[in-house]
Amino acid sequence: MPTGVHLRDARQQLFDAAERVLLRDGPNALTSRAVTDEAGCAKGVLHRHFADFDAFLVDLVLDQAAQIETRASALRASAGTGTVAGNLTSALATLFGPVPMAILPLITFRDELRARLRRARPGGGMAILAEATTAISAYLADERDRGRIAADADVDSLTLSLVGGGHLLFTDDFTADDPGPPAVGTFVTAVIADAVRRRPG
């Protein structure tokens, strides 16, 4: 007698199930059985779509990285509107949302996953952080070109500070409430204060 339910879009439903397990139980609880149990499907479904569990995790990470790239487009589109600090505050809350923050420990602690990600794409070993870095760097360069931050602002250093500090702000416990706009906004404002103060005219 068959076990589980039929999945119409099996890959996406397995990804969704994995994200729920990560958010509820943390990265140590993420196993192939936990994913298929959460999805309510037979245990063999995952292995019909992926060579092994690490192959599943690679596609899960790359799917999340692609979503971050989409959000990055919205950040770049905001250049020249609102405030630089406000745009970056919103972006950090999105780029380091609960799911990306739950996935990052998988990349950090699973050597095989990291190795496969490197093979799958350049810089893939640090997927998600790499996409966040690219997004923020491109946005800051756009704002510098528009004269909203100093012409000699060191975009690379600002980006590293924002990504590194933003990551730490959201790392404490990704299953708990996020640090909230005030804390993130205060951090962002402090990082970019000099570059904004010295902007042209």
Predicted regions and their residues:
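Hydrophobic alpha-helical connector segments
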Residues: 59, 72-102, 158-159, 185
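Helix-loop "lid/cap" segments that line or gate small-molecule binding pockets
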Residues: 77, 89-100, 106-116, 189-196
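Basic, helix-initiating cap at the start of DNA-binding domains
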Residues: 1-38, 54-58, 79
